[in-house]
From Swiss-Prot:
The name this protein goes by in its record: Virion host shutoff protein
GO BP: symbiont-mediated degradation of host mRNA; symbiont-mediated suppression of host gene expression
Enzyme class, UniProt record, top EC level: hydrolase
SUPFAM superfamilies given in the database record: PIN domain-like
Intrachain S-S bonds: none
Length: 365
């Protein structure tokens, strides 16, 4: 899911860039991980021909992910839809808005349980979700457990509260919420798509982008009613944008996005206009509410979702593997691989302090 055709547009205009890690030695870069998006992507890419059971393949896939994160000096904060165990109910966001719109139209399909997010590739093994989550918990990694939010919204919250520097996912609707994305961490220089580069390419500010490209959101529109990014971009061509304006608009990362988000509603056609479906307006209202800091006296505060980090415990890692793999020898082998290649992660608060405070001070010298 995401913005229909954005990756194609981004590659055509060379907006997907290889990024060198620029933090000082010993400083980890905090990033949000859209867990199931990333795991399914790795499963499809590397485990099509596996003959091992699903639990073993899940463990090996997670091990691959954690090793890549460690090599790139990333500190992951794991995020998933409907809480870390996936047993909540989404009450806000694009999927909830679309479900409510479908129910209002009298389509009973909205009352059906959500379809599992699954690979279209025939031989891709299934992920054992409970095993994956328990390994993350017992290895001592940080995660977010908010049962009524989509992963995309949690990632956007972490990004705009200056908790994470980027979001690792292939869901391009993160750009619509003003976030920078890591598309692939496997290359030595990870592939990154930045919101400000997309805006500069289109010659729009964030409010204009949100108002115009919401019609490309595949969670809000069903084919063939969804527009592609290229279609909308072509409709914007011919507008003159002074070079100095572009420079001013995209000089910073977050403040302009927070400031401009609320203007998007004023750019939409009037409520009730057929050119502005209700779902689009409600989604933009949701994004504005999500990105706008609340006023507390003379302060503006954007609250961060709570982060959980449990102590690492090798016995619980082995127990989780044994429970799902059901082969003691293989469970011991896998537990040994995790403990050999993945050092226990540091406290997330220390990581954030080192990156956002100490690292910024280092850059100013």
């Amino acid at each position: 899911m995401g913005l229909f055709g954005l990756l194609k547009y981004a590659h055509r205009h060379r907006l997907v860039r290889s990024e060198a890690i620029s933090t000082p030695p010993g400083v980890l870069t905090p990033i949000a991980i859209d867990l199931w998006n990333v795991m399914y992507t790795l499963m499809e890419k590397h485990y099509q021909e596996t003959t091992e059971d699903n639990a073993t393949t899940t463990a090996r896939c997670l091990l691959r992910l954690l090793r890549m994160l460690h090599k790139r000096t990333y500190f992951p904060i794991f995020v998933s839809d409907r809480g870390i165990f996936g047993n909540g109910r989404i009450a806000r966001g694009a999927k909830a808005i679309m479900a409510a719109a479908v129910r209002a139209d009298g389509d009973g399909a909205a009352d059906a349980p959500p379809r599992p997010r699954w690979s279209t590739m025939l031989h891709a093994p299934r992920i054992v979700h409970r095993l994956c989550v328990n390994l993350i918990r017992h290895m001592g990694y940080a995660y977010v457990d908010v049962s009524d939010m989509e992963a995309d919204d949690v990632c956007a919250n972490l990004y705009h509260t200056n908790t994470v520097a980027q979001v690792h996912t292939t869901d391009t609707d993160m750009i619509l919420t003003g976030c920078d994305m890591i598309l692939d961490i496997a290359p030595v220089f990870p592939l990154v798509l930045r919101c400000r580069d997309v805006l500069a390419s289109l010659g729009v500010d964030y409010s204009e982008f949100l108002a115009a490209f919401v019609r490309c959101h595949t969670d809000l529109h069903r084919a063939p009613d969804v527009d592609s990014v290229q279609q909308v971009a072509e409709s914007l061509e011919g507008r003159e944008v002074a070079p100095e304006d572009v420079k001013l608009k995209y000089a910073s990362r977050c403040p302009d996005i927070m400031r401009d988000a609320g203007k998007a509603l004023a750019l939409l056609p009037a409520a009730g206009d057929a050119r502005s479906p209700r779902a689009e307006r409600e989604f933009i209202q949701h994004v504005v509410a999500m990105l706008t800091p609340a006023r507390h006296g003379h302060l503006s505060v954007l609250r961060r979702v709570p982060i959980v980090q449990e102590p690492s415990d090798v016995n619980k890692v082995f127990g989780s593997l044994l429970r799902h793999v059901k082969n003691e020898t293989r469970a011991k082998e896998l537990a040994g691989l995790f403990w050999k290649h993945i050092p226990p992660p540091p406290n997330y608060q220390a990581v954030l302090m080192a990156y956002w405070d100490d690292c910024n001070a280092h850059r100013r010298k």
